[in-house]
Amino acid sequence: MGKFQVISHPLIQHKLSILRREDTSTKDFRELVNEIAMLMGYEVSRDLPLEEVEIQTPITKTVQKQLSGKKLAIVPILRAGIGMVDGFLSLVPAAKVGHIGMYRDEETLEPVEYLVKLPEDIDQRQIFVVDPMLATGGSAILAVDSLKKRGAANIKFVCLVAAPEGVKKLQDAHPDIDIYTASLDEKLNENGYIVPGLGDAGDRLFGTK
C-alpha cells in the first residue's frame, strides 16, 4: 500500500492559509502555488537514491554524495497543475516535463482527457504527478491510468489540498502510489468542490472564469 502523507511544515501551512483567502490576487496566488510546490518538492524527494562520487575541491580530492542518476519526470494535470511545475524544476532542473490535459464535465463531474504528451522513456522515470487539488479523484485516477498504460510504475501524486473522498478513490484505484498533500480538508460539497478548499485553482491561477 502506498503511503498518504500530509506535509505540515510551518512555511507550507502559512502560505496555504494565504492561498485560500478569497481576496488573494491572481499574481499572489500564482506565486504562492509556485512557492508551496517548491517546498513540497523538497519533502517528497527525500527518498531519492544517492551514490558516492569522487570530486576535486580547491583543496583536495574527496568522496561526496550526489543523486544516483535516477531519471525524474514532472507531470502536471492541465491546466492548474502547470502552476506547480516551476517549483519542482527549481529543485530538479534536469527533470523532464510531461502533460496530461483534462477538463471536468460540469454535469457528470467526471474528467475528460484531451491531451497526453510524455517523455518517450516515461516507463524508466520516477514520476511526480502534480495538481493543486485532489477533489473527486477522477482526474488523478485517469492520469495515473494513462501513465501506467505507457509502462510507468514509480508514481507519486502531489497536491496542495485534498478531500477525503478523493484520497479514498485514488487509493482504491491505485493502492501502489504515494499521495502527498499540504492539507486534508473536510469534504466535497454538492458541486464537487473541496470544503473549505481554495476555489477553482485554474481560474485563480490564470485570472479566468
UniProtKB/Swiss-Prot annotation:
Chain residues that bind 5-phospho-alpha-D-ribose 1-diphosphate: 79, 104, 131-139, 200
Function (record text): Catalyzes the conversion of uracil and 5-phospho-alpha-D-ribose 1-diphosphate (PRPP) to UMP and diphosphate.
Reaction equation(s) it catalyzes: UMP + diphosphate = 5-phospho-alpha-D-ribose 1-diphosphate + uracil
Pathways per UniProt: Pyrimidine metabolism; UMP biosynthesis via salvage pathway; UMP from uracil: step 1/1
Record's cofactor remark: Binds 1 Mg(2+) ion per subunit. The magnesium is bound as Mg-PRPP.
EC number of the protein: 2.4.2.9
Protein name (database record): Uracil phosphoribosyltransferase
